[in-house]
């Protein structure tokens, strides 16, 4: 699909950057000659806009070998960022998709500034080509034909091999994010814990990773009472899924991803209202993020050891379901008083974290659609983070800045720990109250990370979008897939 060339050839469409300071770049000047001065007229009359994310289409009318030019406004260079570029190109690729373009080129060097080099631009272009044109996988009987971009050429004077490598990495990041989106969008009667485990096994086998899928009996032997409690009411068997990627000869410096895999959450006996229940098929967004990251890792083969652990079940009501006031024993040996069966994700993750440590994780990053409280605190565009290790958090933060997936750190104070430890009957309680809900959930998980460096990522607000946006349609976003993979790719760098 991807090609790199030094000279512009015949294409259906060519994408060109327009900055406010460079309305008459060398390329535009040359092209204007072919258009007999008409481009300059369009610029002067503002028919070609330099405004951020403005897309101006110009037909060549046979004056060049290119059928149509798409000029992408990027505003002033001083305010040009990777986020601006991602949004602008995402919108552009959506426009090309709507026009059913199959052969497009991007004038890569027109997007290069002192802030962003050609490799950065190539990576982002290939990434958002996939993200921006992603479509929901539906179950409608009337299937519409989709015209795909078959040929995408980067025009640049830079080294072709380096640009090809950047295009490949960007493409893999975009495709894996879309894989995660598809998982989150699947209905709960299709994506059960068993089906999620089957998907994970297929992924592991494709990329020659080791894997384990623990069944209920094995979980009982290991004392995974927290996950098993959540599963008590279900007819669907639980799964504890583990993928093991060995990027080094020695099993050291192991990064452990733990993704919440609740395939549907009714709230249990702490039942959600109807409005709060619809959409809870997406409560396995953390699991999807982890699997998406493992897809990237499998493709790119970084020299880093990684474990991905996914505790998976649904949380439903029945005569056997767990109840408020139950006391359960987690794999760690710590006992938990259940005050809220709708705070089930942290119970599943507690055993997932302990199991990741058992498998050898030296660093822990858990990802979960955990609390509505994080949405109240940070909205729908920022992931909440908590940590017991600032050095590890800084690496996660840097990765998120590279991928434009914003995160914000929330605190853990001793008084927060006292609240989750406040129980007359057990070591911990699973829900101290509504105040500081997002912080309480993260603090609870920290009790199981203990001294292992750990970062908690609450993606309840960022896992799905209520409306279409420049990087995709309404629905699942694939939040944190690219950040987790970038963390692994950059881990330990100075």
UniProtKB/Swiss-Prot annotation:
Top-rank taxon: Bacteria
GO biological process, one term: proteolysis
EC identifiers of the protein: 3.4.11.1, 3.4.11.10
Positions annotated as active site in the UniProt record: 272, 346
One GO CC term, this protein: cytoplasm
Reactions listed under catalytic activity: Release of an N-terminal amino acid, Xaa-|-Yaa-, in which Xaa is preferably Leu, but may be other amino acids including Pro although not Arg or Lys, and Yaa may be Pro. Amino acid amides and methyl esters are also readily hydrolyzed, but rates on arylamides are exceedingly low; Release of an N-terminal amino acid, preferentially leucine, but not glutamic or aspartic acids
Protein's UniProt keywords contain Isomerase: no
Entry GO MF terms: manganese ion binding; metalloaminopeptidase activity
Main location: cytoplasm
Annotated positions binding Mn(2+) 1: 265, 342, 344
Binding-site residues for Mn(2+) 2, renumbered to this chain: 260, 265, 283, 344
Subcellular location: Cytoplasm
Gene3D superfamilies per record: Leucine Aminopeptidase, subunit E, domain 1, Zn peptidases
Cofactor note: Binds 2 manganese ions per subunit.
Reported cofactor(s): Mn(2+)
Secretion signal, residue range per the UniProt entry: none
UniProt-listed Pfam families: Peptidase_M17, Peptidase_M17_N
Keyword Metal-binding tagged: yes
Keywords: Aminopeptidase, Cytoplasm, Hydrolase, Manganese, Metal-binding, Protease
Protein function: Presumably involved in the processing and regular turnover of intracellular proteins. Catalyzes the removal of unsubstituted N-terminal amino acids from various peptides.
Similarity field: Belongs to the peptidase M17 family.
Protein name: Probable cytosol aminopeptidase
Gene: pepA
């Amino acid at each position: 699909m991807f090609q790199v060339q030094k000279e512009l050839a015949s294409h259906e469409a060519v994408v060109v950057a327009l900055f406010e300071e460079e309305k008459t770049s060398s390329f535009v000047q040359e092209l204007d000659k072919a258009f007999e001065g008409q481009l300059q007229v369009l610029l002067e009359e503002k028919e070609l806009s330099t405004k951020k994310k403005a897309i101006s289409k110009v037909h060549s009318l046979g004056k060049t070998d290119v059928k149509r030019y798409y000029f992408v406004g990027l505003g002033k260079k001083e305010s040009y960022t990777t986020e601006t570029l991602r949004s602008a190109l995402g919108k552009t690729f959506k426009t090309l998709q709507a026009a059913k373009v199959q052969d497009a080129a991007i004038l890569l060097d027109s997007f290069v500034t002192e802030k962003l080099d050609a490799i950065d631009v190539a990576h982002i272009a290939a990434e958002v080509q996939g993200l921006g044109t992603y479509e929901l996988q539906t179950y409608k009987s009337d299937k519409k034909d989709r015209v795909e971009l078959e040929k995408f050429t980067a025009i640049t004077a830079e080294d072709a091999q380096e640009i090809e490598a950047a295009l490949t990495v960007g493409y893999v990041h975009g495709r894996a994010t879309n894989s995660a989106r598809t998982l989150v969008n699947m209905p709960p009667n299709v994506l059960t814990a068993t089906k999620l485990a089957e998907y994970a096994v297929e992924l592991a086998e494709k990329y020659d990773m080791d894997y384990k899928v623990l069944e209920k009996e094995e979980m009982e032997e290991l004392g995974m009472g927290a996950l098993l409690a959540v599963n008590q009411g279900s007819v669907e068997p639980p799964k504890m899924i583990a993928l093991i990627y060995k990027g080094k000869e020695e099993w050291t410096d192991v990064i452990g991803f733990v993704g919440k895999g609740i395939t549907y959450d009714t709230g249990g006996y702490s039942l959600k209202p109807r409005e709060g229940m619809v959409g809870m098929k997406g409560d396995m967004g953390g699991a999807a993020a982890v699997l998406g990251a493992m897809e990237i890792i499998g493709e790119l083969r970084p020299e880093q050891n990684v474990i991905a652990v996914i505790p998976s079940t649904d949380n439903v009501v029945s005569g056997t379901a767990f109840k408020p006031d139950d006391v359960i024993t987690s794999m760690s040996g710590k006992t938990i008083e259940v005050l809220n069966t709708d705070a089930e994700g942290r119970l599943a993750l507690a055993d997932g974290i302990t199991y990741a440590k058992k498998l050898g994780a030296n660093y822990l990053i858990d990802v979960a659609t955990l609390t509505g409280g994080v949405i109240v605190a940070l909205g729908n565009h920022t992931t909440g983070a908590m940590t017991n290790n600032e050095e590890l958090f800084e690496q996660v933060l840097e990765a998120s800045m590279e991928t434009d997936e914003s995160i914000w750190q929330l605190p853990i104070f001793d008084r927060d720990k006292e609240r989750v430890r406040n129980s007359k009957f057990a070591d911990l309680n699973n829900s101290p109250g509504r105040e500081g809900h997002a912080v309480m959930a993260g603090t609870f998980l920290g009790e199981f990370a203990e001294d292992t460096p750990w970062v908690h990522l609450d993606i309840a607000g960022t896992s799905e979008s209520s409306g279409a946006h420049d990087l995709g349609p309404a629905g699942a976003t694939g939040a944190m897939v690219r950040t987790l993979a970038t963390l692994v790719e950059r881990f330990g760098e100075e």
